[in-house]
């Protein structure tokens, strides 16, 4: 039995459970303290003035709470949230329809905003700055521009690849924040809260074990908690004990550092198939049978954070730590392993 922690499609039941455990207020949001403290000030000031909150850009790896924070911003500002994603906005008309439907104080959340087509993105510029959009009616000699008013709103954009944002779009966000991975102690706090909402107890040692293998990511921690609940209930237990947590994690093949099957396939390919690198991400994607974007957005950030992988101008390179752990002892690596030089 195997799972891909971040790339597994989420069905309707999972989405409902995720929504159930999602914090609704800023004070219930755990972690990212500096970010949330600043947002509290910005939101309070905007409400005192009766203005829409400045547009907010949230960047960072998947599963750290960007979508949750967008919901909280809408709740704190007293507006409605309309959510979409960059790939869905493939036509300017789709974006225009959404923008003109917004009421004063509403929040428009665009996930994966870096994947929005450039032609559509340009329609956002005047909407963000002047709360208006210009659309073209007809074509050829009879074409004419029509200006439509947009109610003051807040755009919350989320991205896992902030470097792919165009400079004009990035410059229009008045508030920009980056999410960091969570330390285990904060993930424990999240797990204790989530277990209460899900109606099952969890021992502190069990929460600690799950937190330590959750890759610093609340979404993964909560998914593992739900799987541990499954094991506990099938075994007739009313509380998740440490042995139950260990049984769950072992069954899902998640090691002590939170690496899953795909992480290990990636590192095995870099270390053994490509002799430690450098290797291009396209070749790596073909080697492990995964999408290039998924490797770059989902797996690489944590492997780099964990000290196993480095990005260089020539490609991905295994660190000395990775060589020592993942090498199958091939002759091509022996000199690298013991020459005292680390790829950086």
From Swiss-Prot:
Domain of life per record: Bacteria
Reactions the enzyme catalyzes: ATP + H2O = ADP + phosphate + H(+)
Subcellular location: Cytoplasm
GO molecular function: ATP binding; ATP hydrolysis activity; four-way junction DNA binding; four-way junction helicase activity
Positions contributing to Mg(2+) binding: 67
Binding-site positions, DNA: 311, 316
InterPro entries membership: AAA+_ATPase, AAA_lid_4, DNA_helicase_Holl-junc_RuvB, P-loop_NTPase, RuvB-like_N, RuvB_C, WH-like_DNA-bd_sf, WH_DNA-bd_sf
Top EC class for this record: hydrolase
Keyword presence, ATP-binding: yes
Binding site for ATP: 21-22, 63, 66-68, 129-131, 172, 182, 219
Major localisation: cytoplasm
Primary role: The RuvA-RuvB-RuvC complex processes Holliday junction (HJ) DNA during genetic recombination and DNA repair, while the RuvA-RuvB complex plays an important role in the rescue of blocked DNA replication forks via replication fork reversal (RFR). RuvA specifically binds to HJ cruciform DNA, conferring on it an open structure. The RuvB hexamer acts as an ATP-dependent pump, pulling dsDNA into and through the RuvAB complex. RuvB forms 2 homohexamers on either side of HJ DNA bound by 1 or 2 RuvA tetramers; 4 subunits per hexamer contact DNA at a time.
The protein's assembly and partners: Homohexamer. Forms an RuvA(8)-RuvB(12)-Holliday junction (HJ) complex. HJ DNA is sandwiched between 2 RuvA tetramers; dsDNA enters through RuvA and exits via RuvB. An RuvB hexamer assembles on each DNA strand where it exits the tetramer. Each RuvB hexamer is contacted by two RuvA subunits (via domain III) on 2 adjacent RuvB subunits; this complex drives branch migration. In the full resolvosome a probable DNA-RuvA(4)-RuvB(12)-RuvC(2) complex forms which resolves the HJ.
Record-linked NCBIfam families: PRK00080.1, ruvB
Domain commentary: Has 3 domains, the large (RuvB-L) and small ATPase (RuvB-S) domains and the C-terminal head (RuvB-H) domain. The head domain binds DNA, while the ATPase domains jointly bind ATP, ADP or are empty depending on the state of the subunit in the translocation cycle. During a single DNA translocation step the structure of each domain remains the same, but their relative positions change.
Similarity-based family: Belongs to the RuvB family.
Protein's recorded name: Holliday junction branch migration complex subunit RuvB
Gene name tied to this protein: ruvB
């Amino acid at each position: 039995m195997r799972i891909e922690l971040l790339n597994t499609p989420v069905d309707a039941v999972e989405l409902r459970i995720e929504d159930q455990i999602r914090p609704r207020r800023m004070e219930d949001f755990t972690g990212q303290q500096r970010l949330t403290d600043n947002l509290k000030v910005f939101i309070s000031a905007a409400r005192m003035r009766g203005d829409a909150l400045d547009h907010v850009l949230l960047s960072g790896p998947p599963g750290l709470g960007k979508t949750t924070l967008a919901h909280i911003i809408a709740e704190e500002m007293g507006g409605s949230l309309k959510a979409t994603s960059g790939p869905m906005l493939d036509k300017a008309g789709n974006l225009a329809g959404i923008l003109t439907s917004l009421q004063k104080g509403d929040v428009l959340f665009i996930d994966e905003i870096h994947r929005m087509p450039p032609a559509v993105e340009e329609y956002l510029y005047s909407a963000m700055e002047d709360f208006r959009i210009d659309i073209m009616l007809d074509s050829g000699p009879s074409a004419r521009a029509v200006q439509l008013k947009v109610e003051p709103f807040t755009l919350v954009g989320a991205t896992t690849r902030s470097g792919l944002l165009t400079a004009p779009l990035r410059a229009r966000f008045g508030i920009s924040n980056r999410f960091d991975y969570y330390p285990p102690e904060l993930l424990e706090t999240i797990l204790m809260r989530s277990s209460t909402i899900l109606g099952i107890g969890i021992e502190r040692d069990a929460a600690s074990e799950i937190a330590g293998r959750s890759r610093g990511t609340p979404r993964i921690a909560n998914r593992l908690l739900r799987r541990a609940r499954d094991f506990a209930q099938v075994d007739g237990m009313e509380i998740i004990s440490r042995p139950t947590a260990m049984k769950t994690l072992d069954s899902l093949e998640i090691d002590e550092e939170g690496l899953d099957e795909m992480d290990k396939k990636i590192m095995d390919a870099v270390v053994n198939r490509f002799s430690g690198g450098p290797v291009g991400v396209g070749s790596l994607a073909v080697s492990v049978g995964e999408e290039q974007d998924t490797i770059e957005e989902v797996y690489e950030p944590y492997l780099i954070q964990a000290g196993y992988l480095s990005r260089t101008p020539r490609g991905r390179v295994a660190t000395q730590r990775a060589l020592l752990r993942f090498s199958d002892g091939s002759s091509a690596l022996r000199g690298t392993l013991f020459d005292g030089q680390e790829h950086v």
